[in-house]
Every structure is written in structure tokens, then in C-alpha cells.
Amino acid sequence: MKQVNGEKLLASLGDGVKDIRGRITPDAPMDRVTWFRAGGLAELMFQPHDIDDLIAFLKILPEEVPLTVIGVGSNILVRDGGIPGVVLRLSAKGFGFVELAGENRILAGAICPDKHVAAMAMDNGIGGLHFYYGIPGAIGGAARMNAGANGVETRERLIEVNAVDRKGNKHVLSNAEMGYSYRHSAAPTDLIFTSVLFEGYPEDRAQIRAEMDAVRNHRETVQPVREKTGGSTFKNPPGHSAWKLIDEAGCRGLVIGGAQMSSLHCNFMINMGQATGYDLEYLGEQVRREVFEKEGIKLEWEIKRLGVFMPGREVRPFQGVTSE
């Protein structure tokens, strides 16, 4: 059942789109661009050629049209009714770069894979960024959510973020202005991150390589890296590990439709082949219910759920009461 009308939305933008150099796709299948390989259509998907093209598009986009920004498609779950409005997917050509930006500093485009930042740092003897080798996704998302691994978080290495707002105005946010906390930033949600500046410290390349190898080996041993998964499903509650709570609640390997909580790492939700957005979200809410009933702790989603439900296939979020 089609829930969006991309051609109509595209036509409403008028002649201004003729000057846009990036790719505009009406009714774009989101299951082709998300790591879960599930979900409905984006009413309109836009992939800007570069930052100037992005700004030009934003200036012709009416304020009432919803705008959803995605990265490489990790850490998101798209609902089966699709995403109304415009989905902005930054292009690798314009936003996938990574380069040196001074002594022990690296500048990366928002769509640059996290592991490419780690590799650039290693090649140039810059320590402190090796942890990105074990984080799936892109740098823009890592900056937005304060991604971390192996005891290190983005906020420890980030200097500033370059961004544009909904009207196409440029902004620079310092580390302090990002307002970081665990897996969260207080940066305005309407800002579109375009690049991120990091600073590390001098370190022997062989040592960095060893650290990266340890990160990779650990990840491949304990995480379902070859499955259709969006990464960690839930945040770790204070003083607890989400995976342990899920395991103790008996949800390791739990299956709903085509979705499963991984038997290898039970805080990873996987698409076993034909899972729908409904299957995945229903499974997540069921796990939240089971953990609360057995452990008295309410898990919070780390995966972002985007879009609208198909009529008759809504998933009611578990409310519960946060334990004291």
C-alpha cells in the first residue's frame, strides 16, 4: 500500500529544482539504503552534490515540508508506511572526505565512515581515534549521538562541527556547544552536520594498528557484523549493560516475524531475511516490556525509528515506569 506521493511533492518545488545538481528520487525505497533492509518509501530522497548544492536545495524547500536526515543507513529503523517529506542522504562524493587539518587534527565529511577516520589517524600517527574502527556508521551520526566504543566517546576527541540549518545558513558548533551526554547531544535537531573536526595526539603507528586490530577482533567475535542489523538497539541504563538485562529477561534469540534479537549479542536486532519495519519495532517493544517486568528497568531505544506506520500495523510503545 503506497503511503507517499513523491512526484506530487517534486512538482510542488517548482522550477528551482532545475538548478539542483544532486540526485532527486521520488518514492525512494528505504529498504535499499538502510542496514536493516526494511521499511517503506521516502516521499522524496535528495542526495546533494556538495554543500553549495545542499544549501541551494534548502532555500527552495518550503518550511512546512518535513525533512529527515540520514547517514549511511545504520542505527535507523524505517516504518513500513514510509517517510513523508524529504529524506536527505548526503553523497559520498561531496561529504565522504577525510583529510589532515593541522597537527594531530583530522577533518571528516559527515558521511565519511567512522572506520576511515580511524584509518587516517593510524596512517599519520594520530592516537585517540582508534575506537572509531569498531563503530558502524558515519561521522555525522557519531557526532550527533556521541558515539563511543571501548571506553572512549566522540566528545573526548571532537573540536567542532560544521553544519547548515533548514534555511541554508552555515554554523560552527564547538565541543561545549554540542552539549554532550551519554549517547546524546543537545545540538539543535534542525541542524544538518556537514563535517567534523577532531584532534588526537602523537602515537606510534604500530601501537595504533594493534589497538585497531584489537577493536576489530573483539567486534567480529561478539557482534553479528555480517547480519542485517542497525547496531546496538538500546542504550545502556546507568550502572547496567543492556545486553545483560535482555539476556536475563530471557530475550536472547527472541523472534517476532522475520526479526530476531541476536543469539550472538542480544542487544543487536537482526533481520533474518524478510523482516518488516513492523516486525523489528514490535520485537524491540516486546523486549522493553520483558526487561521491565523481570528487571524493573525501562530500556531506551538507541536505534532511531523514522516514518509512519502502515494503517492497521501500528506498534504501541511500551510506557512502563522508570525504576527508581
From Swiss-Prot:
Pathway: Cell wall biogenesis; peptidoglycan biosynthesis
Spans traversing the lipid bilayer: none
UniProt keyword annotations, A-Z: Cell cycle, Cell division, Cell shape, Cell wall biogenesis/degradation, Cytoplasm, FAD, Flavoprotein, NADP, Oxidoreductase, Peptidoglycan synthesis
Catalytic site positions: 183, 232, 302
Tagged with keyword Chaperone: no
GO cellular component: cytosol
Reaction catalysed by this enzyme: UDP-N-acetyl-alpha-D-muramate + NADP(+) = UDP-N-acetyl-3-O-(1-carboxyvinyl)-alpha-D-glucosamine + NADPH + H(+)
EC number: 1.3.1.98
Compartments in which it is found: Cytoplasm
InterPro entries per record: FAD-bd_PCMH, FAD-bd_PCMH-like_sf, FAD-bd_PCMH_sub1, FAD-bd_PCMH_sub2, MurB, MurB_C, MurB_C_sf, Oxid_FAD_bind_N
SUPFAM superfamilies per the UniProt record, alphabetical: FAD-binding/transporter-associated domain-like (SSF56176), Uridine diphospho-N-Acetylenolpyruvylglucosamine reductase, MurB, C-terminal domain (SSF56194)
Pfam families given in the database record: FAD_binding_4, MurB_C
Cofactor(s) this protein requires: FAD
Residue ranges of domain FAD-binding PCMH-type in the record: 36-203
A GO molecular-function annotation: FAD binding
Superkingdom, taxonomy of origin: Bacteria
Main location: cytoplasm
GO BP annotations, alphabetical order: cell division; cell wall organization; peptidoglycan biosynthetic process; regulation of cell shape
Family note: Belongs to the MurB family.
Functional description taken from the UniProt entry: Cell wall formation.
The protein, known as: UDP-N-acetylenolpyruvoylglucosamine reductase
Organism the protein comes from: Rhizobium etli (strain ATCC 51251 / DSM 11541 / JCM 21823 / NBRC 15573 / CFN 42)
Gene, per the UniProt record: murB
